[in-house]
């Protein structure tokens, strides 16, 4: 495998060496966190709007973990999302869904409470960064790698749907990929169930939430009825983007949210095969278009009716002959 392959770096830590220097390490290297000083913080590996993620070690179980720490000043809505992500991650048990191990609170000297949870530590990168790296190199991901990634993503979604949970935020940034250090096979993990919908409760939207570029038409309207097919739609748009390197509505990146919602409801994107190389075999080009068209149908009744249906179609039509 060439060192320029955007997936090549997945056997290393996330942005090795750089994140630890660039991101403030507020917990402090060598700090302890949790009951009986259980977790030893090693370094900060990332930062987002809600807080930071640390690489740490659990000496009791002799394993590395990731600690997600929420900022103390975030609004209550973000706190609920943070807790929801932890609760669903702890509830699920699937090889393609990141596992959550523990949850707790820290009280600072100023009296502010900081919430945290631990999850499995994954060296690698999310698909958003992989796509950015590929674009910088003028490359696209190989079709077989894309099929392998989505085989695992769709299996994870099917499992969640069987548990009566809709993710509602499927996108490249929430799909993490790494390589098994021994087999070199791709391992994919679905992340962040923070805005997931429990179908055992009300399934109609009272507030809009999610990334507008991956929201199904029924997610863009208050009162829309949501089920597993909303995730199928998001998976279809993500499949298009990962395969071609461009989002179906790439031209709307700077547009108002209302314009993106309108496109999700009414606009039919260019077929993905139009963005692939001319050397793409006609059989594969037709299969790619068919899978995207079925997954991203505006009417939920015309989509794949489950994540498993989409996965099986990909394996039948896009696997090597």
Language model features: what each stretch is:
Residues 149-150:
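Activation segment signature within eukaryotic-like protein kinase domains
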């Amino acid at each position: 495998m060439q060192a320029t392959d955007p997936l090549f770096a997945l056997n290393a830590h996330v942005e090795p060496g750089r994140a630890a220097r660039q991101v403030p390490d507020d917990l402090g290297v060598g700090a302890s966190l949790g009951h009986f000083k259980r977790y030893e913080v090693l370094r900060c590996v990332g930062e987002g709007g809600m807080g930071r993620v640390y690489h740490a070690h659990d000496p009791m179980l002799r394993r590395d973990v990731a600690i997600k720490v929420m900022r103390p000043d975030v609004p209550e809505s973000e706190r609920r999302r943070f807790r929801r992500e932890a609760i669903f991650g702890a509830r699920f048990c699937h090889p393609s869904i990141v596992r959550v191990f523990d949850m707790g609170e820290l009280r600072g000297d100023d009296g502010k409470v900081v919430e945290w949870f631990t999850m499995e530590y994954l060296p690698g990168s999310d698909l958003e960064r992989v796509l950015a790296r590929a674009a910088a190199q003028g490359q696209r991901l190989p079709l077989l790698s894309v099929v392998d990634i989505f085989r695992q993503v769709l299996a994870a979604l099917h499992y969640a749907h069987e548990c009566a949970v809709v993710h509602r935020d499927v996108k490249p940034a929430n799909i993490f990929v790494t390589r098994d250090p021994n087999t070199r096979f791709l391992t994919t993990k679905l992340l962040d169930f923070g805005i997931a919908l429990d179908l055992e409760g009300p399934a109609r939207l009272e507030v809009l939430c999610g990334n507008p570029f991956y929201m199904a038409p029924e997610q863009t309207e208050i009162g829309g009825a949501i089920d597993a097919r909303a995730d199928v739609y998001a998976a279809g748009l993500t499949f298009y983007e990962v395969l071609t390197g461009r989002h179906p509505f790439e031209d709307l990146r700077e547009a108002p949210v209302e314009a993106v919602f309108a496109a999700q409801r009414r606009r039919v994107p260019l077929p993905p095969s139009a963005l692939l190389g001319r050397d793409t075999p006609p059989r594969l080009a037709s299969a790619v278009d068919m899978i995207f068209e079925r997954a991203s149908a505006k009417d939920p009744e015309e989509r794949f009716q489950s994540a498993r249906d989409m996965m099986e179609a990909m394996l039948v039509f896009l696997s090597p002959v």
